[in-house]
């Protein structure tokens, strides 16, 4: 068994460890939105977005946004839904 295969089976499922709001923030980050865009979309402050992202990193055991997004995508994230609807983001 390769090391990569072992690491993949040990990945935490974000849906199991994150709150619904943390998952929503992570999904929007995965779409490439900035903290300001996420804050605007969710009607919260940029500070609140940063707070949620810090909790995401801690709960998933990652150290940055890219690692969190990769983990979310590897565990079946972004299947659709309100958080992934970008129609209101088109200029």
What feature does the model see in each segment?
Residues 2-23, 81, 85-88:
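Regulatory hinge/linker segments at domain boundaries
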Residues 27, 40, 70:
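A cross-family signal for key residues in well-ordered alpha-helices
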Residues 29-33, 72:
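Short helix-to-turn junction characteristic of helix-turn-helix DNA-binding domains
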Residues 32-67:
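Recognition helix of helix-turn-helix DNA-binding domains
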Residues 19, 26, 50:
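Conserved catalytic core of two-component sensor histidine kinases
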Residues 23-24, 67:
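Pre-recognition alpha-helix immediately N-terminal to the DNA-recognition helix
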Residues 10, 58-91:
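Basic, Lys/Arg-enriched C-terminal extension of HTH/homeodomain DNA-binding domains
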């Amino acid at each position: 068994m390769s090391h990569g295969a072992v690491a993949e089976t040990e990945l935490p499922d974000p849906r199991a460890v994150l709150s619904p709001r943390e998952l929503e923030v992570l999904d929007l980050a995965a779409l490439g939105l900035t903290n300001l865009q996420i804050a605007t979309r969710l009607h919260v402050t940029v500070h609140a977005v940063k707070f949620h992202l810090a909790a995401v990193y801690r709960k998933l055991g990652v150290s940055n946004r890219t690692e969190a997004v990769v983990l979310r995508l590897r565990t079946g994230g972004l299947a659709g839904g309100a958080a992934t609807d970008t129609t209101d983001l088109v200029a």
